[in-house]
Amino acid sequence: MRKKSKTPNRAFKVADQIQRDLTELIARELKDPRVGMVTIQAVEVTPDYAHAKVYFSLLAGDPKACTEGLNQAAGFLRAGLFKRLHIHTVPTLHFLFDQTTERAADMNALIARAVASRAKED
């Protein structure tokens, strides 16, 4: 009987560790004024560990400028990850603004309006 491949589980562990380390690196070592209060929401790593999509949200500020700042600092952050992670290949980082929280707020507003209009009708 063949053993199950542990690669997917390892990929999740690597992505989780990248998320934790990036959070610390951005908060403590990144000095770019365009990058404000950033929260790393998720990290998706390709099966060959060559690339990682890093989804982030922003408390305040311009998401476009923050994305530019993070993508320009990707090499610096990757070097910091290389010192912390003990894996052969540290992925190239691609930062993407996560609009999930904004969409959730918009959806909540739509639901609240629908409930309010239904209450007026009754």
UniProtKB/Swiss-Prot annotation:
SUPFAM superfamilies: Ribosome-binding factor A, RbfA. It is found in: Cytoplasm. It comes from the Bacteria. Keywords: Cytoplasm, Ribosome biogenesis. GO terms for cellular component: cytosol. The keyword Cell inner membrane does not apply. One of its GO terms (molecular function) is ribosomal small subunit binding. InterPro entries: KH_dom-like_a/b (IPR015946), RbfA (IPR000238), RbfA_dom_sf (IPR023799). Its main location: cytoplasm. Monomer. Binds 30S ribosomal subunits, but not 50S ribosomal subunits or 70S ribosomes. PANTHER family: RIBOSOME-BINDING FACTOR A, CHLOROPLASTIC-RELATED. One of several proteins that assist in the late maturation steps of the functional core of the 30S ribosomal subunit. Associates with free 30S ribosomal subunits (but not with 30S subunits that are part of 70S ribosomes or polysomes). Required for efficient processing of 16S rRNA. May interact with the 5'-terminal helix region of 16S rRNA. This is Ribosome-binding factor A. The lineage of its organism: Bacteria, Pseudomonadati, Pseudomonadota, Betaproteobacteria, Burkholderiales.
